[in-house]
Each structure stands twice: as structure tokens, then as C-alpha cells.
Amino acid sequence: KRMNRILEVNESSHYAVVEAGTSQGMLDAYLRKHHPQLKHSLPDAPPAATIAGNIAIHGSGHLSQSEGGFHSEMVTGLEVVLPTGELVKLGSCSTVPAWFSRAPLPDLAGLFLGWNGTTGVITKVGIKLFPRPKYHDVLVYMTEDIDLAPMVLDRVIGTSMAEDINYALAPKPDYLRGFQMTVVNFTANTEEELAFKRKTLRSVMKDLYETRDSGFMPVPPNMKAGFLEAPQKALSKFADVRKGGGFEYVGAIMPIERIPDACRAGMEITARHGITYSLGARIIGRGNAAMFFFAYPFNRVDMDEVERVKKALEETNETALALGGIPWKTEVQGQQAILRQMEPGTYALMKRIRAVLDPEGIMNPGNWEVA
């Protein structure tokens, strides 16, 4: 926790170097105060969540659609302590005194990203920064047909004008019941540019909303403020919909075309277990993937409901794999479900890498291991 210094911000090459305990909120506040023209991609997580922790789990955020994918793909360099106690640097910082890139060197950073702490301990991170435009707006497109999702999302992505694209459906609040919502955030440096982007984003939906089966929702100022937040707080507010403060979810990385099937599966699972839901996705890359969430709130004092949610979560992990997705940030049970479906040669390679880096087997035993 004491390793929380922001060591460098390079305004020209757009990167920051931070210690592993630096939180998302700390970096965001520091940039707003000292480098207001720059920002980093913020996950929908509490401000205390760390930069290093989020990149290590392949996290994503409000710039993942427009600026390069998962946060692990925004890493420009790492400093890591190996299980043997050796300190190593990875990326350009290993060769020259700057943290600007992982290329063109052999990319060893992947040995410590997604491994659940089984290969080493990250102590410093180089992370990409991005310009902070002056203007920010949002459009909300409503549909009644889940199968329209891939088409709607593809059209928005195709404009190359959205900063963040999110899709959601839930039985609460009441205005969402029976509808699906695509939230499109976009930015600009001038009012003219903002107006042009707004017009273009609306135009690509014209043939759809002229049928009156879908359309743009008017967004009043109080609602717009929430949509413009980064990180988004809507899910944390949804956590208390059962008035008990309990909330768990399964995230799954999957192809965009599987979103309709994932929505149906989530509704079927919750109906079987007698619980409620919020379902949705954030687009990663320019349409390369989606981080789909199956979110289940519950009353923590209702132990029967707690057990039903646990069973629903277990079923959801298996369902995500069956849909062609991969459970994200999963616990040991979910990891084992992934490994059962993984190519044997891939898992054998993972074991060999761990044996080389951690010959004594001391780093997070139980993670990424077959039961």
C-alpha cells in the first residue's frame, strides 16, 4: 500500500510510470491537477482499485473501445520481482531510461498479465495516457429486439466516433423493462466537432428508427450527468436494488455476435434460480470483443437468496464457456472450468513457464491449476 507514488508523467510520449499501489483515483486526480490535457482509461471500479491490479487481470475501462483494448494492452512497461527474488524490467525501460513501449523487444510482459500472481509480483507499471478533449456528450439508443444488438453496435463502431460503447438491459428501473439500451459516449475538441459526431452517429441508425421499432431516447440533464461519469456508478447503485447490499457478477470476454444469446442465457438462469439481474456489455477494441457482465444483486441477510445466487454464478461460468466466451477475473473454480476446455498443449506450456519462474511453487498455489 505504501508503494503508491506517481513516478513520471511524460506529456510528449503520453505515458505515466506508477508504483504498484497507485490507485485509479490517485492517478486521475493527479492528471486533472497537473496534466489536465491527459487522461487514462478508468475501469468501472472504486477509486481505490489499483492500476497494477487492473492491468494484471486484463481489466477494461471507458477508453477500451476507442484507445486500444484491454488495460493490459495499454501497458508500456513493467518492473517485476520474480519468485526467486530477482528484480527485472520489461519493455523499453529494460534497455533505455524511458517507459514508452514494449516493442520492438521480445514481449515478456505477458508472463505477468492474466496469471493471477503465479509468476511474480509487479512493482511498477508504465501505462498509456490519452488526450482529454474539451467536450463530452452521450446518445442513448433503445431497442425492443435483443437480436438487433450486433447490428446497432457494429454501426456505432463503424463511425470511429465513439469513445465508449455500452449495452445493457435490466427489469429495473421500470423504464428499462422490455428494452435494451446502447449508450454511446463521444468527445470533441470543439462544439462544431461535437455536433458533427452527434449528427453522424444518429444518421447511421436512420433506417432503423424510422421503422419506430427502435430509436434514440431523450436524455434529461440529471440522467445525462450519470451517463457522462467515468467510472460509471450505475452498477454500484444497482447493487442495492434488493435492499441488502449484496452484489456479484460474472464477467465474460466474448465475440460481439454472442451478446443476444448471452442476454437470453442470463435471463433464463435468473428465472430458474428466482433472482433478478442486470445484463450488458462494454465493447473492447474497435469491435474486437465485448466484456459481457451477468450481474446478480441479492439481500445479504437472506441466506436462501445468497445460496441461489451462488448456484447461478456457477452455472453462469459454465454457460459463458458454452456460448464461446471466456470467464474473466474468475475464482479458482472458474479457472478450472476454463482449463478443462483449454487445449492440452496450451496448459502444458503454462505449467512449464511456471516451473521455470517459480521452481518452488510458492506463488499463489491453486491458481491456474487443475483440481
Which sequence ranges carry the predicted segments?
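Feature of Fe-S/electron-transfer and energy-metabolism proteins
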Residues: 30, 256-257, 370-371
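FAD-binding subdomain of flavoenzyme oxidoreductases
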Residues: 5-9, 19-156
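Catalytic cores of large soluble enzymes that bind and process phosphate-bearing ligands
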Residues: 15-22, 43, 47, 66, ...
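Glycine-rich N-terminal segment of FAD-binding domains in flavoprotein oxidoreductases
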Residues: 1-3
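Short glycine-enriched loop/turn motifs at secondary-structure junctions
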Residues: 9-13, 133-137, 178, 244-246
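C-terminal substrate-recognition/cap domain of FAD-linked oxidoreductases
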Residues: 141-315, 323, 330-334
